[in-house]
Amino acid sequence: MASFCKHFREDIQTIKERDPAAKNYVEILLCYPGLHAIWFHRLAHALYQWGWFTTARLISHFSRWFTGVEIHPGAKIGRRLFIDHGMGVVIGETSEIGDDCLIYKGVVLGGTTLEKKKRHPTLGNRVIIGSNSTVLGAITLGDGVRIGSGSVVVKPVPPGATVVGVPGRIVESLTPEKEALDFEHGNLPDPLSDLMRMILQLHSKLEERVKRLENQNPKSNSDLGVKND
């Protein structure tokens, strides 16, 4: 019981420290569905470990209805997890989440097999997963990993890496000195934008080259029916 109370206090304090929108403790207690989902899960997980599987599932089912967050009672969750906004989050049975992680709305930690074995992701400590991202399979995301919004991750990610895109690609690796919980989506590298920028630059260079060739060979252009402006 003392351990439960300690975790409850930590959960509340975590939100106070990491969400600038949290005005006071009463608001946190009453208005944070992600917090409620974690509390329901702690109870359901304890019952699940004691073999009360159906009761645990009923609590999990009620929690999903009440909070919009679905956490299987078999999932193992570390300390100070913050589920921000929460709606649509799904955490599968064999998922494991380390300490001090941050999960935004719409995140799915899903499985890729019907076999009754480890089939869901394992998250290290201080992992951040952006909204509407999907992490599939029995893969491991190392400590300090950041997953950009809307990404689909199906391969293991080394500690400190940043992953974006579909499928997820590693675009940056942080050193331990630079590792932080800040997650400015606008500052994340975007490989698709970089690719488009490169294509546009190449197109511009080709246009300039064609114009130079046209100016050097006006007679050839007229023979081909090309008009020079």
Language model segments and positions:
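Structural signal for interior beta-strand "rungs" in well-ordered beta-sheet cores
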Residues: 64-171
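Solvent-exposed, flexible loop/coil residues
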Residues: 34, 39-42, 75, 81, ...
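Proline-rich intrinsically disordered, low-complexity coils
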Residues: 20, 73, 121, 156-159, ...
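Terminal amphipathic alpha-helical/low-complexity segments used for targeting or macromolecular assembly
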Residues: 1-63, 178-229
